[in-house]
Every structure is written in C-alpha cells, then in structure tokens.
Amino acid sequence: MIQDISRIKYTVKGLDIMRITITGRNIDLTQGLKDAVEEKLSKLEKYFKPDTDVYVTLSVEKERQKIEVTIPTKGHVIRSEQVSSDMYVSIDLVEE
C-alpha cells in the first residue's frame, strides 16, 4: 500500500532542473527522509537536461530498507537500487 507521495521540483535561477517524485511503501515519508533524498539527488542535476523526471520509491519489507531510483532519459532508463537495514544508509549508497 502506498502511504505517501511527495513531489519536489528543483528550481535554479528560474530554470526547472529536475522533478523528483518520492513514493513511500510501508513507510512514513518524514521530512528528514525527503530532505535526505533531495540532498543526494540534487548532486546529479548537472548530468541531466532541464525538466528531467526522477522517480524514487522508499520501501520497508521486514528488516530491509530499500530505495529505488529511476531516471528515464531519451533512449535509456537509469536505475539504481540499494537495500540495507537503515534507510539513511540506503539513501547514501544509492547515489554511488
């Protein structure tokens, strides 16, 4: 069951850089989690064209804290997934 969906749009000097949609499954999307995702993914904005959509799913399954990031681009889909026992660790690892 999807509990919360947040949409965050980055704007730098009036230009739309990336749109991040964060979905939580079996987890409450706290402001701290949203901020951690924003901070990590904002470092990637220099690699993508303006108006790039980024889809993030945070989920909890028993002891598994999982983050999935999907970035559709022209002709490709970039995807990263990390699992650990701590969601903040998973968020840190997904950027790499």
What are these regions (language model features)?
Residues 2-96:
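N-terminal, polar/charged subdomain of small-to-medium soluble alpha/beta proteins
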